[in-house]
Amino acid sequence: MGKFSISHLVKFGEQKHLYRLLKYGEIYMKNIDFYREYELSNPEHLRGDIYECFNNISQHNTIKFLDSDLEINNVTVYENNNTYTGYLFCMYAIFTDNENKGLDSRMLDFGEYAVIILNPKEFIYRIKEYGKANHLFPNCSPVMYFNENYHSGTLHPFMKREKYSYQSEARIYIHNSNPLDYLCFNIGSIEDIAILKRLDYKSQSNTEFLTTSDNRQ
């Protein structure tokens, strides 16, 4: 995470869930399939992504069908061979060079409360230490966003389509070849490096969002 200069990480959600994150360091990770299925049932909500963690994208001028005269022009093809299976924990990342950028109001769709992690390096360190002790091997990084109309090549769990860029996401990915619906573990209280607050969306910049008084619960 170092070269990306993340100053804060933010987890949006319901108060009861975020309290557990703050108080116990509860890391609740959803199966990748949750996000794929969510878009199918909620296409208007950008919380889900039908192409989540697919492994390749390619652009084609024309696709012709065998034994048919049918042709389709300008086609984008996504491929998934289940290279990436497992769990995701998603957060909003605030970078040192965009603290004056406005906080997108669509983030309210993720919940009316937020845990603001004031020391991202320490937070990730604690997760990695837990992972080492429990053979989980978490990978942590900001998400790279790509233009799906032009990009071709391999994909990985830290790449998403450009339409999701307002989420400014950093995520934790843990591989598991036979994942359950979710993975949940505790790293211990993070009250020393984080605060819980209720959101107030009044065209706040990231700086205003971070400096307004917290609402510890």
Model-derived regions, located:
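NAD-dependent ADP-ribosyltransferases
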Residues: M1-Q217
